[in-house]
């Protein structure tokens, strides 16, 4: 495993663009995906859908070459909500910040996790199966909502 220092922890580099992901592929043991794509017109970042995440994962795998089996993939979960009204509010709040195809089906946005703890845990398993993501980062304001999901996802 690669680390920034011989006895140090594995290096994690996270990003979305080609340049940073190439650096990550060359040096990191853990490669994180932020899940937000820069608008081509210089506008605000947009939450990516599954297609965009798949493209980024494929790009990284291509850049890793023979190192692919040595590297763990990480995804930043931007927000976690329960089901019902909480999920609806989450998706409506973030809909303007999604790429167009993801806004049609906000539940397909990999970085937003909503639903019952069982459904959310199943979603994490789906992301692992489909994209090979085995490491998830959750922001502090979603940690309590994530706790029952974690218990079911193990």
Model regions: which residues?
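Active-site-adjacent structural elements that line small-molecule/cofactor binding pockets in enzymes
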Residues: 1-154
């Amino acid at each position: 495993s690669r680390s920034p220092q011989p006895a140090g922890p594995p290096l994690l580099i996270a990003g979305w663009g080609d340049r940073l992901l190439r650096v990550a592929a060359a040096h990191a043991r853990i490669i994180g995906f932020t899940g937000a794509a820069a608008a081509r017109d210089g506008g605000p970042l947009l939450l990516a859908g599954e297609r965009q995440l798949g493209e980024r994962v494929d790009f990284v795998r291509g850049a890793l070459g023979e190192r692919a089996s040595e590297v763990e993939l990480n995804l930043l979960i931007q927000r976690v909500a329960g089901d019902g009204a909480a999920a609806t509010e989450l998706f409506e709040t973030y809909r303007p910040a999604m790429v167009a195809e993801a806004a049609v089906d906000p539940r397909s946005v990999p970085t937003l996790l909503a639903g019952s703890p069982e459904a959310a845990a199943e979603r994490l398993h789906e992301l692992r199966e489909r994209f090979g993501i085995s490491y998830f980062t959750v922001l502090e304001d979603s940690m309590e909502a994530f706790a029952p999901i974690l218990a079911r996802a193990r």
